[in-house]
């Protein structure tokens, strides 16, 4: 059975009324408890025949388990079946002790199709919680288990690397590494990537063969793929992979690098895909999404060529694999692909609070 914490507040001047409702639905045996919640600075406004809800609030939760909590994922919805009616909030890189309270910030825009209903009803459900031993609790409807574990493995990898830098070269070497991370993040070319359902074809589209980076010691290798491109849009009819591992594969995530007509390269994010592959077997996926790519200020980008690399693998036994530091630090990727959530968090700590606080943070876990 699910317990329902029903919280409502009238916020005059914020566009919300007493009829607007914020519902938090957590399982009765949830290892996370709701301490407090309200609408915060949220707003709701009718636009056409729909109700637009700008949900801006912070939930206060508590770890009621006996393990340290590493990440949490929530599903937030006003209308699950409508476009724009559902979203998710995930918070990785946590270190919440048993009994400790922690905030989860929500900043989302949701669309409730029927404004005539007269009230905004926002449902917040727990999709999953990850603990220090990589155990997971939750329905996992959004596939958050895979992503939370991947984020945690990347965090451990990057923390280990920075600790090695500190051990070998002291604070000066660590400081230099953090300055390089900050400089790379500033210099990294940015690309706006928008996903949509792939059409059967684009007008005047052309075929481009995907060039895959060599990953000889990885558990899964991308072996073939083509994209159909038209201007700044692309769709991917098929991608082929080979499983080199003894474990059965459940899903693969492919990182994409785009080169434009002027020879500039950009990271286009990653493309996760469910893919069942037996040990030492092969498989093909046919992604259903298309990508629209724009540079800064909405300027379209003309796609010239595409490179790909395996960024994540999930196995049917629950294991998740992420690339090692040596591959992450390959010059081309370092220049183009943003660092992990944990690397960004630690570099922000160094930038805002200095070396002493960074050292304290590295020694925590």
Give the positions of each predicted feature:
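Positively charged n-region of N-terminal signal peptides that target proteins for export
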Residues: 1-5
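Hydrophobic h-region of N-terminal signal peptides that target proteins for export
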Residues: 6-18
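Low-complexity, acidic Ser/Thr/Pro/Gly-rich terminal tails and inter-domain linkers that flank the onset
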Residues: 19-56, 64, 81, 147-238, ...
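Short coil-to-beta strand junction motifs in C2/discoidin
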Residues: 55, 69-74, 117-124, 233, ...
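Short acidic, flexible loop segments centered on an aromatic residue
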Residues: 64-83, 127-128, 244-265, 311
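Intrinsically disordered, low-complexity Pro/Gly/Ser/Thr-rich segments with frequent PxxP/GP/PP motifs
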Residues: 81-117, 262-301
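Beta-sandwich strand segments
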Residues: 85-86, 134-143, 265-267, 318-327
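Short, surface-exposed ligand- or partner-binding patches at beta-edge/loop junctions that are enriched
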Residues: 113-133, 295-317
């Amino acid at each position: 059975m699910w317990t329902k914490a029903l919280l409502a507040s009238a916020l005059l001047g914020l566009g919300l009324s007493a009829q607007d409702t914020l519902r938090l639905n957590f399982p009765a045996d949830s290892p996370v408890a709701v301490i407090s919640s309200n609408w915060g600075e949220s707003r709701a406004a009718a636009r056409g025949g729909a109700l637009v809800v700008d949900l801006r609030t912070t939930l206060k939760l508590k770890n009621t388990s006996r393990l340290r909590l590493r990440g949490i994922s929530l599903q937030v919805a006003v209308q699950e079946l409508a476009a724009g009616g559902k979203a998710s909030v995930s918070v990785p890189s946590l270190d919440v002790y048993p009994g400790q309270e922690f905030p989860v910030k929500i900043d989302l825009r949701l669309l409730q199709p029927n404004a005539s209903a007269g009230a905004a009803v926002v449902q917040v459900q727990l999709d999953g919680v990850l603990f220090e031993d990589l155990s997971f609790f939750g329905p996992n409807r959004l596939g958050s288990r895979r992503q939370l574990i991947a984020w945690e493995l990347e965090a451990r990898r990057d923390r280990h690397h920075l600790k090695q830098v500190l051990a070998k070269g002291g604070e000066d070497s660590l400081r230099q590494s953090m300055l390089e991370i900050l400089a790379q993040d500033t210099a990294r070319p940015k690309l706006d990537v928008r996903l949509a359902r792939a059409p059967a074809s684009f007008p005047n589209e052309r075929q481009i063969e995907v060039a895959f980076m060599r990953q000889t010691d990885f558990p899964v290798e991308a072996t073939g793929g083509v994209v159909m491109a038209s201007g700044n849009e692309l769709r991917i009819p098929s991608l082929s992979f080979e499983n080199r591992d003894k474990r059965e594969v459940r899903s693969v995530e492919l990182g994409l690098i785009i080169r434009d007509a002027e020879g500039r390269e950009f990271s286009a994010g990653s493309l996760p895909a469910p893919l069942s592959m037996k040990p030492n077997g092969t498989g093909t996926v046919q992604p259903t999404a298309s990508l629209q790519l724009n540079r800064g200020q909405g300027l379209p980008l003309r796609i010239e060529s595409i490179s790909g690399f395996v960024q994540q693998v999930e196995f049917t036994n629950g294991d998740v694999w992420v690339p090692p530091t040596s591959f992450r630090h390959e010059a081309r990727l370092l220049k183009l692909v943003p660092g992990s959530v944990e690397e960004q968090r630690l570099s922000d700590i160094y930038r805002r609070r200095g070396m002493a606080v960074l050292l304290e943070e590295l020694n925590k876990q």
